[in-house]
Amino acid sequence: MDITIQHPWFKRALGPLIPSRLFDQFFGEGLFEYDLLPLFSSTISPYYRQSLFRTVLESGISEVRSDRDKFTIFLDVKHFSPEDLSVKVIEDFVEIHGKHNERQDDHGYISREFHRRYRLPSNVDQAAITCSLSADGMLTFAAPKVQSNTDPSHNERPIPVSREEKPTSAPPS
């Protein structure tokens, strides 16, 4: 029986280059070719995955932008339909919730659920907030900012999610 021994300096030296699998958002999506490479699976550790081949937008990680005149959130929700998504503004926060029941995919049956909560800037016009879902599954939450320092209304208000026909391959820079 072979046991791989890893020195602490080896883990720390490569730690920033190889993200931890413990907090991986890609569970349930199957294996990739680089998951099966013995170099990364046995030499380093079974708890690490080489994720350099994925772009940020494919990973499900959100992008938040706060420009001078607009606050925008881009979130990859490609596994959810508009009926599976709920977007609400509660006081100074926007809450995005997605849930779909168990369904069959290429690897078996899967159900997914997520909750995201973002603090809105104090100068956002909450009455003019929009939210849309592109054909390729990119959710775009946009809130224009007002120049005056008026206090926004503090109540819960659902934001409808509209479907766009064109894909959003990347958020505009």
Curated annotation (Swiss-Prot):
GO terms for biological process: lens development in camera-type eye; negative regulation of apoptotic process; protein refolding; response to heat. Zn(2+) 1 binds at H100, E102. Zn(2+) 2 binds at H107. Residues 153-167 have a biased composition (Basic and acidic residues). GO terms for molecular function: metal ion binding; structural constituent of eye lens; unfolded protein binding. Heteropolymer composed of three CRYAA and one CRYAB subunits. Inter-subunit bridging via zinc ions enhances stability, which is crucial as there is no protein turn over in the lens. Can also form homodimers and homotetramers (dimers of dimers) which serve as the building blocks of homooligomers. Within homooligomers, the zinc-binding motif is created from residues of 3 different molecules. His-100 and Glu-102 from one molecule are ligands of the zinc ion, and His-107 and His-154 residues from additional molecules complete the site with tetrahedral coordination geometry. PANTHER family: ALPHA-CRYSTALLIN A CHAIN, HEAT SHOCK PROTEIN HSP-12.2-RELATED. This is Alpha-crystallin A chain. It comes from Tupinambis teguixin. The lineage of its organism: Eukaryota, Metazoa, Chordata, Craniata, Vertebrata.
